[in-house]
Amino acid sequence: IAAGGFFDGRGLVAALAYGASGVAMGTRFLLTSDSSVPQQVKDYYLTKGVLDTVVSTQVDGVPHRVLRTELVDQLESGTGKVFALPRAALNALRFKRLTGTPLAEMLKEGLAMRKSLDLTWAQMVMAANTPMLLKASLVDGKTESGVMASGQVVGVIDDLPTCADLVHRIIDEASSVLDSLTAK
């Protein structure tokens, strides 16, 4: 399955030509009228361009492409790092409360992640941020205080079709591209 930058039928055909079995379209399907993300968050995404994303390791030590927000810019510049550790600890407790995951299990998972990804202690603790920061934006609608995962394709998406309409559009576009290629 190919992923990264796919949002239409042309991309699907290109990926299939390269040997993929299919494509993942995370940002494209996030931005549909059927998506459970709050409307104000979808509207926020629709205002963003292709240069409004950044690959950041500052949230949890692992590279993620996210929308540039005030919080992300603070983390990237270092001005948000002063409060990162206390915030991560608070978020770990919130995550425990939200999921019922015992702290010992969270610590065990964190230590395994630290070892396998060669993370620092700070990065390991900050990994507790990710679920709560994603929830803040994508569930609670707090675009200013959360982290919003996004592909660069966010800058070329300008509508919120239903998932059914989007799938039909992608199929129609892919068929059109294939027809034009076989006609040559």
Regions found by a protein language model. Give the residues of each.
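Short beta-strand/loop segments at the ligand-binding rim of alpha/beta enzyme cores
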Residues: I1-A3
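Conserved active-site-proximal phosphate/metal-binding subdomains
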Residues: F7-K184
